UniProtKB/Swiss-Prot annotation:
<dbReference type="Pfam" id="PF08468">
    <property type="entry name" value="MTS_N"/>
</dbReference>
<keyword id="KW-0698">rRNA processing</keyword>
<dbReference type="InterPro" id="IPR029063">
    <property type="entry name" value="SAM-dependent_MTases_sf"/>
</dbReference>
<dbReference type="Pfam" id="PF05175">
    <property type="entry name" value="MTS"/>
</dbReference>
<keyword id="KW-0949">S-adenosyl-L-methionine</keyword>
<comment type="similarity">
    <text>Belongs to the methyltransferase superfamily. RsmC family.</text>
</comment>
<keyword id="KW-0808">Transferase</keyword>
<comment type="function">
    <text>Specifically methylates the guanine in position 1207 of 16S rRNA in the 30S particle.</text>
</comment>
<dbReference type="GO" id="GO:0003676">
    <property type="term" value="F:nucleic acid binding"/>
</dbReference>
<dbReference type="InterPro" id="IPR002052">
    <property type="entry name" value="DNA_methylase_N6_adenine_CS"/>
</dbReference>
<comment type="subunit">
    <text>Monomer.</text>
</comment>
<dbReference type="InterPro" id="IPR013675">
    <property type="entry name" value="Mtase_sm_N"/>
</dbReference>
<keyword id="KW-0963">Cytoplasm</keyword>
<dbReference type="GO" id="GO:0005737">
    <property type="term" value="C:cytoplasm"/>
</dbReference>
<dbReference type="InterPro" id="IPR023543">
    <property type="entry name" value="rRNA_ssu_MeTfrase_C"/>
</dbReference>
<dbReference type="InterPro" id="IPR007848">
    <property type="entry name" value="Small_mtfrase_dom"/>
</dbReference>
<dbReference type="GO" id="GO:0052914">
    <property type="term" value="F:16S rRNA (guanine(1207)-N(2))-methyltransferase activity"/>
</dbReference>
Length: 339
């Protein structure tokens, strides 16, 4: 089994976990929890990633929680935090989990050095001591313990609020840390919205993030039936809050590409992700494009924005027979295809 670099450095330090009830959280991407479970009293996972949750949900040996906040009761006395790409998300997870588990909780933090994992030294200072105990494969391994009472966690305090102006409409956006375009209006999304035709029927917003695209589409096309999906529980929570803030209706839910969606969409609209953690990752978008025809109605349309360097047109052409470029600027292109 090939593990990620953070898991490999953790594997070197299994003695830290002996006799512990370990709760794993953060940017975990491999099957290392199964290995860890052999060396500790119990292992559970809290993940905001729906795809990762689905991988572990079927295994009885490891309990897996999915959501934007851990609300279930757990007997964990140690956190293993895989440092996420966004520092703000790390702080969110750390604060939320320590508030849940309480004083005396031990913590191990692992991550690639380029991800900014060193920030844990300052971030954890108010909770207790933490020190680096290992470095390998350009990763660091920290161990610490919460010796102070953690403050009460209220998720509402973590939403960043900002406004998006589009065609004389003002959209109130509420976004949690770790969500794409957190706190700002992404230029690719703006070009996509400027290019969209009038929408009708059942519309899917794939990779909804904080809900900007879906909210604008619903504001301009109030009669559409809107589904908004994302793999991230933080995005789902953000989109729900954004719709609520604008008195809009839509169905927001987690889906690993089309795993939980309906079929027969008139439009699939997306600013799809192409990063997973610190690495460029295209597989979910490729699946989005390849399977789009079978999820569209007759003459249904796929419209997406992408960075100009991404080679999506050949995939779209293979799936649909043709790929049109509706608009472009020096960074983004808008692609479209019709069933």
């Amino acid at each position: 089994m090939s593990y990620s670099a953070p898991s490999q450095i953790t594997q070197r330090q299994l003695a830290y976990f002996e006799g512990k009830h370990v709760l794993i959280a953060g940017e975990l991407i491999d099957d290392f929890p199964f290995e860890l479970a052999k060396h500790c009293e119990s292992t559970s996972i809290f993940t905001t990633n729906y795809s990762y949750y689905k991988q572990f949900a079927e295994h009885d040996s490891i309990h897996c929680y999915f959501g934007s906040e851990l609300t279930e009761t757990t007997n964990a006395d140690m956190i293993l935090l895989y440092w996420p790409k966004a520092k703000a998300e790390a702080e969110y997870l750390l604060t939320m989990l320590l508030a849940k588990l309480g004083k005396s909780t031990e913590i191990v933090v692992v991550g690639e050095n380029r991800s900014g994992v060193k920030s844990i030294e300052k971030m954890f200072a108010d909770f207790g001591p933490i020190n680096k105990f290992d470095s390998a494969r350009r990763c660091s391994f920290y161990w610490g313990q919460c010796t102070e009472e953690a403050p009460t966690f209220n998720q509402q305090d973590w939403f960043k609020e900002y406004q998006v102006e589009f065609e004389n409409h003002t959209i109130e956006v509420r976004s949690l840390p770790g969500v794409f375009s957190h706190g700002e209006f992404d230029k690719g999304s703006e070009l996509l919205l400027q290019t969209l035709p009038a929408l009708r029927g059942h519309v899917l917003d794939f990779g909804c993030g904080a809900g900007v695209i879906g909210s604008v589409m619903k504001t301009i096309n109030p009669k559409i039936h809107l589904d908004m999906v994302d793999i991230s529980a933080l995005a789902i929570a953000s989109s729900i809050e954004t719709l609520k803030a604008n008195n809009l209706e839509g169905c927001v839910f987690a889906s690993d590409v089309y795993s939980d969606t309906k079929e027969n969409y008139q439009f699939i609209v997306s600013n799809p992700p192409f990063h997973a953690g610190l690495k460029t990752h295209y597989s979910s978008t490729e699946e989005l494009l390849e399977k789009a025809p079978q999820n569209l109605t007759h003459e249904g349309q796929l419209i997406l924005v992408a960075n100009s360097f991404l080679q999506y047109p050949p995939i779209i052409e293979k799936a649909f027979g043709e790929c049109l470029t509706l608009a472009k600027n020096n960074k983004f292109k808008i692609y479209s295809a019709q069933k």
